């Protein structure tokens, strides 16, 4: 069965703060209790202010193969270099969440990390020409996508594949099967305080072969 979900239709006109339940089942989960992360609906999605933390709907859980995509607009320059983007493979979301996230930052770099509770392991990071840097006003618009297929996970920015990881890899020296880890909840991740708009959040399972990045 093909599942396609576009967030725009799910968001009523409400504001959501840290630890509160998001609209239509969406939730905000901050990294620490002292953190503020606010959500405000926009015409095509929502605006996140604050962080670090994640925004997700527990019902948006998918199994490989699938893809998740959203357009991110950094509205102004953050106080320091900050990664923001998508997360996928979310499990144990109410206790010690485990997921992989894919973010971009102001210097044109991307970051892929695995998080399990308080443990964070870096999988890859690099600069890439496809990532649009902020203008003089601190604004930048980039579309991020993660494509999860049987043999690889592809990471795309503005339609270009910036990285790909095989279904078998290692995190912190421990071998694991990625396909066992990447099924789960999909959502949005912010690494540090920032003001960012997220439009057209979308996931699809499965997706067509000719749409895949790898």
Language-model features, listed with the residues they occupy:
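N-terminal secretory signal peptides that target proteins for export/translocation
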Residues: 1-2
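Flexible glycan-contacting loops in extracellular carbohydrate-active proteins
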Residues: 166-197
